[in-house]
Regions:
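Acidic/His- and Gly-rich active-site-bordering loop/insert found
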Residues: 23-136, 156-162
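Gram-negative bacterial Sec-dependent N-terminal signal peptides
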Residues: 1-20
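Acidic/histidine-rich catalytic neighborhood of metal-dependent amide-processing enzymes
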Residues: 141-215, 274-284, 435
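Short, flexible, mixed-charge acidic loops at enzyme active sites
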Residues: 118-128, 215-218, 282-287
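Extracytoplasmic/secreted envelope proteins and their assembly/folding machinery
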Residues: 43-47, 66, 70, 145, ...
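Sec-exported extracytoplasmic/periplasmic mature domains
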Residues: 47-55, 70-79, 153, 157, ...
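Metal-dependent amide/peptide-bond hydrolase catalytic core
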Residues: 23-28, 221-223, 229-435
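Alpha-helical metal-binding/catalytic segments enriched in His/Glu/Asp
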Residues: 109, 129-179, 220-226, 235-259, ...
């Protein structure tokens, strides 16, 4: 028979919190419990979203996913509206506003409804295999929206959502944005009203360690067009015939490679073509060229991107590239055009690092390892960059995934729940602080 002391000790052990729970408030502990209790609900919700195609150009599909999100957010007290993006030639954005007590920091939560997988993609359905969830957008960014909704539901259950001022902005064209002066105008205005921006795109892991994203590089496009005197190839390199357009394009691009590089700056050549004639198609993804081996090339075209960490770095790189273009070989002329509709950079500011520090406070209280600061070279551009000049922010609050943007994209299901707990506690703490 157990002694009274033994029974008492066993009973006490049942109510003694773990070390991590002891560092969390009662409401925060409740949030972690709700996320765990709703795991199957969250996975089922994500599967439903994934099984609805919402490729960027499938406007009806984007709208249907938007309505699915409305059905999740409205019961939590959010006023939801869809912003018509017809003038931008894109699907609609979803904006949901939760009015709190007006005393805490105003939060802007960022994600996107669309995926890269259009209606003609063979990759269309969700499939679960243990901890892996495979399907279009399972990670990018329907998995991120699942983290967001799971966190907000946990906040409501714990009572921390009631007083929080939160705006959710889910774009319908993140993967292929329409003209930014139209498609991002309302989003930029929301950034100016917010105190903190949180981006629910994917979590990056390095060597098994979760990383915090305080910065994202820009993404812009450029087009190089070279023209030269065409003629019989027997005259190539002579003063009268020159070197032709292809040699000049090669000179320019190779000089870019040798003279423009600097830390955190990359520039890729993704398309090139030339010949006696060459022209881009309407979508600027193909070069239609003609030529013969005995004709000096009269035209060459190349397209590429440029990614940088600051506007100053962009300006510096563009100036170097233009200077190289301005020194043509004999008989050639070239123009270099930078397209204006790019994604700006999100620089690694001290304000952003302060939010990562707050998240690491959450990690410590949850008994999780500290998250290091990710090198921005290791992730692409994102919508948060459009508001980065106006508000402190943190990216990468979505789940971990692999194979994004390709058939077989797979989300780490366990990471959805870890990220939802982190986000719920972080948002609750930030929303209770004075701006």
């Amino acid at each position: 028979m157990l002694s009274k002391l033994t029974v008492a000790l066993c009973a006490a052990a049942l109510v003694i919190p773990t070390a991590a729970e002891a560092r969390l408030s009662r409401a925060e502990t409740r949030m972690t419990q709700v996320v765990d209790a709703e795991q199957q609900r969250t996975v089922d919700m994500l599967a439903t979203w994934v099984n609805q195609n919402s490729g960027t150009l499938n406007f009806a599909g984007v709208a249907r996913v938007g309505e699915m999100l409305r059905a999740e957010l409205a019961p939590l007290g959010f006023k939801v509206e869809m912003l018509d993006m017809t003038k931008a030639g894109r699907g609609n954005h979803l904006v949901a506003r939760h009015k709190g007590n007006g005393r805490g920091k105003k939060l802007l939560l960022i994600g996107h409804l669309d995926t890269v997988f259009e209606l003609d993609s063979p990759f269309q359905r969700w499939e679960r295999n243990g901890n892996d969830g495979t399907g279009p957008g399972s990670g990018d960014d329907k998995g991120g929206m699942a983290v967001m909704v799971a966190a907000l539901r946990a906040m409501q259950a714990a009572g921390t959502l009631k007083n929080a001022d939160i705006t959710v902005f889910l774009t319908g064209d993140e993967e292929d944005a329409g003209p930014v002066e139209i498609s991002r105008a309302a989003f930029i205005e929301e950034g100016k009203r917010a105190d903190v921006a949180l981006d629910f795109e994917g979590l990056v892991q390095l060597d098994g360690r979760d990383m915090g994203s305080t910065a994202r590089r820009s993404s812009g496009e450029w087009t190089l067009t070279v023209t030269a005197k065409s003629g019989h190839s027997s005259g190539i390199f002579t003063p009268g015939s020159g070197s032709g357009a292809i040699y000049e394009a090669a000179r320019i691009i190779d000089t870019f490679r040798r003279e423009v590089p600097e830390d955190k700056l990359t520039f890729n050549v993704g398309l090139i073509g030339g010949g006696a004639t060459a022209e881009l198609d309407a979508g600027k993804v193909r070069v239609n060229a003609t030529g013969k081996t005995n004709i000096i090339a009269g035209t060459a075209i190349a397209r590429g991107d440029l990614r940088a960490l600051s506007q100053e770095q962009i300006a510096r790189a563009q100036a170097k590239m233009q200077a190289i273009v301005a020194q043509p070989l004999n008989g050639a002329k070239a123009t270099l055009e930078f397209l204006p509709d790019g994604y700006p950079p999100m620089a690694p500011t001290e304000g952003n690092r302060a939010i990562l520090a707050r998240l690491n406070g959450v990690n410590q209280d949850m008994g999780l390892p500290e998250m290091g600061e990710l090198d921005p070279v290791k992730r692409g551009a994102g919508d948060i960059s459009f508001v980065a000049a106006d508000v402190d922010g943190l990216a990468g609050l979505g789940p971990a995934s692999r194979g994004d943007h390709a058939p077989g994209e797979t989300v780490d299901i366990t990471s959805i729940f870890v990220q939802a707990k982190r986000a719920a506690i972080l948002m609750s703490r930030l929303a209770s602080e004075r701006p």
